Amino acid sequence: MQLEFHQVDAFSSRPFSGNPAVVYRLDAWLADELMQMIATEHNLSETAFVVREGEAWRIRWFTPSVEVALCGHATLAAAHVLFEVYDEPGERLEFISRSGALRVNREDERLVLDFPAQYPSEVGSTVELEQALGLPPVDVLGSTDKLLVLLESEEAVRACRPDFAALARLPWRGVIVTARGLQKDFVSRFFAPAMGVDEDPVTGSAHCSLIPYWAQRLNKLSLTAQQCSARGGELWCRLEGERVSIAGHAVLVASGRIRLS
């Protein structure tokens, strides 16, 4: 048995930047264990599987080690594949996920994610967190299963060299570091060694928390963002009450088949 897959660089308009994700469009669900093994084989930060349900698509995301409840860049990648490879009609796709209903609109050359806003709240720093990051935070907030850590500058975000083993021992599945940007409204990086991903190149789901945080801090609803990982990526963001819009480009870089037997 063979399955067709497509690899997309999300939040980028050119190959070999942004965040890569593999997408499988399935006729029916595979066993959870098999989907996890496939994701482990690809060894990217996320592999997405989609199955049609009525007029919508149910979507699931797997890192190399675990299934996750929400992933932005792999949803963007899935929408790109459905539109560009499988010729889905219209300008809007509906996804059903563990995090609820998600929508992706095609607007000119960008895809726009409509995701739930996740408003962070103060939790305070700890010695363990500061030792893991290797520098003192300005502020620390919690949002669902992630920490949002404000640093003093974009330079500090770019220079951050965390101890990934120490981060993985914290009671959080991921850590966002962020600061006011020099060219963009804000910059960030995202570390998730507890999920098998030391650093995620561009993280749409992290912006569910970053957008409401920076919208309030900067007193503006529309924001530009850069995730300053080695691959990097640009995002155009907007706070819409209890929802956020996250826009970006995507490019197909590879297609192939995986043998299951």
Curated annotation (Swiss-Prot):
A GO molecular-function annotation: isomerase activity
SUPFAM superfamilies with a match to the protein in the record: Diaminopimelate epimerase-like
UniProt family annotation: Belongs to the PhzF family.
Stated name of the protein: Uncharacterized isomerase PA3578
InterPro entries: Phenazine_PhzF-like
One matching Pfam family: PhzC-PhzF
Domain of life of the native organism: Bacteria
GO CC annotations, alphabetized: cytoplasm
Catalytic activity, EC: 5.1.-.-
Biological process according to GO: biosynthetic process
Keywords: Isomerase
Active site, per annotation: 46
The keyword Lyase is annotated on this UniProt entry: no
The organism of origin for this protein: Pseudomonas aeruginosa (strain ATCC 15692 / DSM 22644 / CIP 104116 / JCM 14847 / LMG 12228 / 1C / PRS 101 / PAO1)
